[in-house]
């Protein structure tokens, strides 16, 4: 059975009414994520974290049009080949976010998928959350959320975590997850890429 990406009740409340298109690695990238997250959780056991490593391609606020949005994502995914993910570094988003991340390389297939989704959504009126232009987007898997840490605690965590990963693990992902949060719970559908 597929594990939920988010299980923390506070996070679930904050995501209510939102939808996301994410990639969920299951091979070497996922193994790297799990091992790194375990180390970080030992250092700050009270900090919230995603239960499953995932790469967000887009977020939405379309609680009343989930079915219509899902159909749009299915149509987009049908024309997208599998996507290569490669770990580039353990990095961090600074305050006010204070999130330690697994940063990914900008592989051609990952950049193309993000760009084509942007182009497709440009012809719609779906309300998007946190969207940035391709050149500003950092492809990543959030490892641990440190926004509640003091500045000193955060700096200690960040300094101990951040590092380059030369020739980092890689894998090819053949599906996307369409995830929506409704009624205090996470729901998802796996959509195969390329048809």
Segments the model singles out, each with a brief description of its role:
Residues 90-96, 171-187:
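Glycine-rich beta-strand-turn "strand-cap" elements at beta-sheet edges
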Residues 98-104:
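Surface-exposed, active-site-proximal loop segments in enzymatic domains
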Residues 20, 99, 140, 173-175:
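Short hydrophobic/aromatic beta-strand or adjacent loop that forms the aromatic wall/cage
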Residues 1-86, 104-167, 185-195:
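Basic, often amphipathic N-terminal segments
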């Amino acid at each position: 059975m597929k594990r939920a990406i988010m299980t923390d009740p506070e996070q679930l409340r904050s995501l209510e009414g939102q939808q996301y298109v994410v990639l969920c690695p299951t091979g070497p990238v996922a193994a790297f994520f799990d091992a790194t997250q375990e180390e970080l959780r030992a250092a700050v056991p009270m900090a919230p974290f995603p239960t499953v490593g995932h790469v967000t391609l887009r977020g939405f606020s379309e609680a009343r049009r989930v079915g219509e949005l899902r159909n749009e994502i299915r149509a987009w995914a049908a024309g997208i080949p599998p996507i290569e993910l490669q770990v580039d570094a353990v990095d961090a988003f600074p305050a006010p976010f204070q999130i330690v991340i697994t940063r990914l390389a900008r592989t051609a297939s990952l950049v193309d998928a993000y760009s084509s989704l942007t182009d497709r959504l440009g012809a719609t009126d779906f309300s998007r959350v946190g969207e940035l232009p391709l050149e500003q987007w950092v492809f990543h898997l959030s490892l641990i959320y440190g926004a509640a840490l003091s500045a000193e605690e955060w700096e200690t965590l960040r300094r101990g975590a951040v590092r380059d990963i030369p020739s980092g693990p890689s894998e090819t992902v053949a599906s996307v997850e369409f995830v929506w949060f409704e009624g205090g719970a996470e729901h998802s559908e796996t959509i195969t890429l390329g048809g």
